[in-house]
């Protein structure tokens, strides 16, 4: 779709939110020297951070746009009495947690803590995905491209600053 700024910025917001999570995950590993909250083991074309490889990075870039395409045009539409953006954020988050459980079962994603895994999926839901969707859909619905640029620019700017400070300068991640 040409000039669909809503989808483009929703996708960038989703992707930027993932980068933030990947950065703090790397910091967890740095500070505890035991394990990250999640890890990306195995073969990859390029491991970016301990829980993020290039394949996952591209998946999150595409996912934000793909999930944005599911949004009804009517922002105020309610489904079963629930605002559609909230309901879709919850449903999509549950779906993503389910996919992560499958990836963990085949060894493509590691979890080393009892509080983050298939037996305790609520944190993956609440921290790992729900904020991604809520922010992505919020950006999607902003009434001007300027607001979208400022919001996504802030998200990506925080990510870049954290990567420079904790990665390039301190070499913690």
Regions found by a protein language model. Name each.
Residues 1-173:
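Aromatic-rich, lipid-facing transmembrane alpha helices and their immediate juxtamembrane interface loops
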């Amino acid at each position: 779709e040409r000039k669909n700024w809503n989808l483009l910025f929703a996708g960038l917001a989703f992707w930027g939110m993932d980068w933030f999570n990947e950065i703090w995950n790397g910091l967890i590993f740095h500070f505890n020297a035991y394990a990250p909250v999640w890890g990306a083991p195995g073969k990859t074309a390029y491991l970016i951070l301990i829980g993020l490889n290039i394949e996952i990075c591209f998946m999150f870039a595409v996912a934000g746009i793909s999930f944005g395409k599911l949004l009804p045009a009517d922002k105020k539409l309610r489904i079963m009495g629930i605002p559609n953006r909230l309901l879709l954020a919850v449903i999509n988050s549950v779906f993503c947690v389910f996919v992560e459980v499958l990836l963990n079962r085949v060894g493509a994603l590691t979890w080393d803590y009892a509080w983050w895994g298939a037996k305790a999926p609520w944190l993956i839901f609440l921290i790992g995905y729900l904020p991604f969707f809520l922010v992505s859909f919020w950006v999607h619905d902003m009434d001007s491209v300027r607001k979208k640029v400022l919001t996504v620019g802030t998200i990506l700017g925080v990510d870049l600053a954290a990567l420079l400070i904790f990665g390039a300068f301190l070499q913690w991640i």
